[in-house]
């Protein structure tokens, strides 16, 4: 398929698990369908960026990831900076007695571009959406470092993880 999910046959589109190269995840297929239908209707659409499709594992603790791992970023030639923040240092995670795991941010050392975010811990499958959104908007580590997060929330761990990239996490 092309970026609009069109096959080689005129007027035929394909989405979901049958499309090679796309993750076999409900949210991936759903967004591919939205892109296809929007394109069919002649409305403005934005293609799905396969690197920005979050992977989610619904277990305990939960796992959420998007983008490149540290190893893959280095293989791709990036100079990387990494920030890591443990949920044991997050107030809300302690309050709900669910503080196993951490958030790891992989960024480009020169420009602060967010290359990947990997989470294992409480509500990881929810938290990963913040990373996906900021990556889609081409936000930087600095952009997230200065985004106000409510307190006490598990999402504050995202703020601390991004701040940790620059050695400025306040809750460690």
Task: Say what each PLM segment does.
Residues 41-42, 58-172:
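Flexible, glycine-rich terminal cap/loop adjacent to redox cofactors
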């Amino acid at each position: 398929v092309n970026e609009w999910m069109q096959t080689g046959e005129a007027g035929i589109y394909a989405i979901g698990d049958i499309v090679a190269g796309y993750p076999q995840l409900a949210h991936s297929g759903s967004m591919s369908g939205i892109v296809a239908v929007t394109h069919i209707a002649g409305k403005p659409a934005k293609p799905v960026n396969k690197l920005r499709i979050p992977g989610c594992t619904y277990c305990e603790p939960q796992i959420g990831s998007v983008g490149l791992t540290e190893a893959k970023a280095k293989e791709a030639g990036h100079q990387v900076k990494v920030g890591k923040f443990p949920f044991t240092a997050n107030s809300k995670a302690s309050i709900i007695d669910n503080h196993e795991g951490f958030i790891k941010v992989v960024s480009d050392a020169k420009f602060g571009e967010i290359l990947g975010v990997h989470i294992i811990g409480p509500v990881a499958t929810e938290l990963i959406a913040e990373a996906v959104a900021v990556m889609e908007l081409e936000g930087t580590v600095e952009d997230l470092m200065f985004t106000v997060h409510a307190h006490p929330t598990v999402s504050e761990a995202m703020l601390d993880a991004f701040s940790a990239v620059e050695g400025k996490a306040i809750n460690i």
